Regions:
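PIN-domain endoribonuclease scaffold, especially VapC-family toxins
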Residues: 1-63, 67-81, 98
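Histidine- and aromatic-rich ligand-binding microenvironments
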Residues: 10, 65-66, 87-88, 103-104
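Short, active-site-adjacent cap segments at secondary-structure transitions
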Residues: 16, 90-91
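Short, flexible helix/strand-to-coil boundary loops that buttress conserved ligand/catalytic motifs
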Residues: 21, 95, 103
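Flexible glycine-rich beta->alpha loop in the catalytic core of nucleotide-sugar glycosyltransferases
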Residues: 82, 89
Length: 104
């Protein structure tokens, strides 16, 4: 991964990464990785919250979309970004989302 270009991360994704850490050393590793690879953490705005609630209404039943993933998708759409994720099941059906799935 090149360090020179900017990458964006929703605050929801950032919190999920920290939540998975088992100890303070892993917390530090996550923070250092985000900083060293120039990730910009994007906040939840009113528009993101509104769009995420619409996604929950539209996609939670047919595709199992949960609140956290709705916030992540809405953050990408509101910032005109392509979302890259291995969570293909939940994101592929969102019509206005630019999405690239991958298998780890």
């Amino acid at each position: 991964m090149e360090k020179s270009s900017n990458r964006f991360l929703s605050i929801q994704t950032y919190m999920e990464l920290l939540q998975e850490a088992q100890n303070k050393t892993q917390h530090k590793y996550v923070k250092d990785f985000i900083t060293s690879y120039n990730f910009v953490v994007l906040p939840i705005t009113e528009n993101i919250g509104h769009r995420a609630s619409i996604y929950i209404e539209e996609y939670s039943i047919p595709s199992g979309l949960r609140a956290g993933d709705a916030i992540i998708a809405a953050t990408a759409v509101e910032n005109n970004l392509t979302l890259i994720s291995s969570n293909i099941k939940h994101f592929k059906s969102i019509k206005d989302l630019k999405f690239k799935g991958f298998k780890p």
